[in-house]
């Protein structure tokens, strides 16, 4: 028997609030073959992870801080500490955060370590690739725009908490004034960039303390050596107040890394030079009523 004129209204629709499988599938809301997906859309409180505190990105992956950069007559210097943190734990004490990306640019990384390191490495390959194809190197504004595009491409991850912000420093060969050719560029998570005009910049969790230090000491910058010293002083001040920034580690022999860029190109500063400067800074900052790092041991009868 057939029912050609069957009245579909005789079959009542689903009650208000009831789960409509066909409608859900048509909207791509739920996978009916997965019971967990069904629970996720209809009763998320029944899932085992429901109501439990989530793990923030800063607790799940290592983060690196802090980077400083200063301009001096004829060039620019960039330095970075060596600590990486994972939540409240120290993930690493000897992270490399300052990378030479070509003959006249250097990139410092802060934020999610894995993403930031890939930024620096990929950026170096991008600059080399362009030069091989075009036969000429990118201009400094072109280098800035290329790095900004890479940062903007990470916006989706940044919105989820995996932020990685580079700090770019370089020497602009097209500047007619060699004494003022040093450049420092900072970036935001959306790919916006700012050419620093004050002469110094810092990124990372300790940046507020590092910038305050550089603001007070920048008048002492006259050449590459004095700029390097101010950079190390700024990192020391940042480590003094920010637990995520690592200061000079005399016990393990771990010190900040630094790169100087002039018209002759980018040069990584020798570790021994930085170590000697760190020891001198610590000695000068030691209080008169305490024992300095190189103070002779005190005998019991001298107490």
UniProtKB/Swiss-Prot annotation:
Listed A to Z, the keywords are:
Autocatalytic cleavage, Cytoplasm, Hydrolase, Protease, Proteasome, Threonine protease, Zymogen
**EC numbers, comma separated:** 3.4.25.1
The pathway this protein participates in, as annotated, is: Protein degradation; proteasomal Pup-dependent pathway
Q: What terms describe the molecular function in GO for this protein? A: threonine-type endopeptidase activity
User: One GO BP annotation here?
Assistant: modification-dependent protein catabolic process
Q: Which residues form the active site?
A: 65
Complex and partners: The 20S proteasome core is composed of 14 alpha and 14 beta subunits that assemble into four stacked heptameric rings, resulting in a barrel-shaped structure. The two inner rings, each composed of seven catalytic beta subunits, are sandwiched by two outer rings, each composed of seven alpha subunits. The catalytic chamber with the active sites is on the inside of the barrel. Has a gated structure, the ends of the cylinder being occluded by the N-termini of the alpha-subunits. Is capped by the proteasome-associated ATPase, ARC.
Function field: Component of the proteasome core, a large protease complex with broad specificity involved in protein degradation.
UniProt record similarity statement: Belongs to the peptidase T1B family.
Any idea what this protein is called?
Proteasome subunit beta
Q: Whose protein is this, by species?
A: Mycolicibacterium gilvum (strain PYR-GCK) (Mycobacterium gilvum (strain PYR-GCK))
Identify the gene encoding this protein: prcB
């Amino acid at each position: 028997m057939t029912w050609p004129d069957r009245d579909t209204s005789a079959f009542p629709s689903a009650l208000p609030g009831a789960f409509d499988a066909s409608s859900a599938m048509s909207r791509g809301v739920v996978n009916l073959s997965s019971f967990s997906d069904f629970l996720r859309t209809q009763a998320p409180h029944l899932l085992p992870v429901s109501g439990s505190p989530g793990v923030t990105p800063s607790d799940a992956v290592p983060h690196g801080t802090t980077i400083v950069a200063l301009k001096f007559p004829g060039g620019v210097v960039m330095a970075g500490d060596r600590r990486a943190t994972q939540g409240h734990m120290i993930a690493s004490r000897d992270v490399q955060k300052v990378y030479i990306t070509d003959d006249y640019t250097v990139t410092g990384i802060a934020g999610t370590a894995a993403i930031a390191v890939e930024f620096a490495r990929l950026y170096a390959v991008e600059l080399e690739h362009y030069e091989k194809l075009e036969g000429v190197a990118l201009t400094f504004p072109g280098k800035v725009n290329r790095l900004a595009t890479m940062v903007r491409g990470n916006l989706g991850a940044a919105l989820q908490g995996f932020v990685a912000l580079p700090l770019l420093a370089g020497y602009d060969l097209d500047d007619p004034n060699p004494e003022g050719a040093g450049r420092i560029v900072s970036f935001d998570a959306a790919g916006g960039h700012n050419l620093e005009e004050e002469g110094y910049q810092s990124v990372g969790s300790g940046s507020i303390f590092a910038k305050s230090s550089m603001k007070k000491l920048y008048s002492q910058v006259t050449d590459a050596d004095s700029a390097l010293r101010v950079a190390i002083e700024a990192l020391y001040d940042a480590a003094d107040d920010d637990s995520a920034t690592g200061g000079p580690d005399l016990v393990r022999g771990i010190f900040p890394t630094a790169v100087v860029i002039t018209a002759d190109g980018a040069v990584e500063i020798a570790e021994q030079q930085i170590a000697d400067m760190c020891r001198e800074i610590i000695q000068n900052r030691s209080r008169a009523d305490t024992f300095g790092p190189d103070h002779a041991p005190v005998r019991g009868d001298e107490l």
